[in-house]
């Protein structure tokens, strides 16, 4: 799907995922023999359109293509890696749409403005004598 970019090589991985500051990158790691998980594509599509005002990108990559992902070769379930400022900040194993939804929403959120301090109770007025 057009909103998911497939990572083809280490150079693209480095440029798009590890060297892109300020953006949450959601990376689906799949096996070449089963391809990207179709079960989560609707979840990703909904998140993509619902959160289009946030710095958020979706990627898919076969674990066999990148030496940096060799630990995931042979896994029977998809792995979802979350990167921000070049660092992995979260990982989900398996198709867990509610958890994916929650994590993407939380990690892609803009920092809310600080809460205003609570107003101190008003001091009683001094009585005139």
From Swiss-Prot:
Coiled-coil ranges (or none): none
Residue ranges of the region described as Disordered: 107-129
Subcellular location: Cell projection, Cilium, Flagellum; Cytoplasm, Cytoskeleton, Flagellum axoneme
Domain of life: Eukaryota
Alphabetical keyword list: Cell projection, Cilium, Cytoplasm, Cytoskeleton, Disulfide bond, Dynein, Electron transport, Flagellum, Microtubule, Motor protein, Redox-active center, Transport
Biased composition (Low complexity): 117-129
InterPro entries documented for this protein: Thioredoxin-like_sf, Thioredoxin_CS, Thioredoxin_domain, TXND_domain-containing
PROSITE patterns associated with the record: THIOREDOXIN_1 (PS00194), THIOREDOXIN_2 (PS51352)
Pfam annotation, one family: Thioredoxin
Domain Thioredoxin: 2-109
Keyword tRNA processing: no
Complexes and interactors: Consists of at least 3 heavy chains (alpha, beta and gamma), 2 intermediate chains and 8 light chains.
Function description: May be involved in regulating the redox state of functionally important thiol groups within dynein.
The protein, known as: Dynein 14 kDa light chain, flagellar outer arm
Species of the source: Chlamydomonas reinhardtii (Chlamydomonas smithii)
């Amino acid at each position: 799907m057009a909103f998911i970019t497939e990572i083809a090589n280490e150079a693209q991985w480095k440029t798009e995922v590890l060297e892109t500051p300020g953006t949450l990158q959601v990376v689906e790691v799949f096996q070449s023999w089963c391809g990207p998980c179709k079960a989560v594509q609707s979840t990703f599509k909904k998140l993509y359109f619902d959160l289009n005002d946030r710095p958020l990108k979706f990627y898919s990559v076969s674990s066999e293509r990148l030496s940096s992902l060799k630990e995931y070769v042979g896994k029977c379930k998809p792995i979802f890696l979350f990167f921000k400022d070049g660092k992995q900040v979260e990982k989900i194993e398996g198709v867990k749409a509610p958890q994916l939804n929650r994590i993407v929403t939380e990690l892609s959120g803009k920092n809310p403005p600080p809460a205003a301090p609570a107003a101190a109770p008003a001091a009683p007025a001094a009585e005139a004598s």
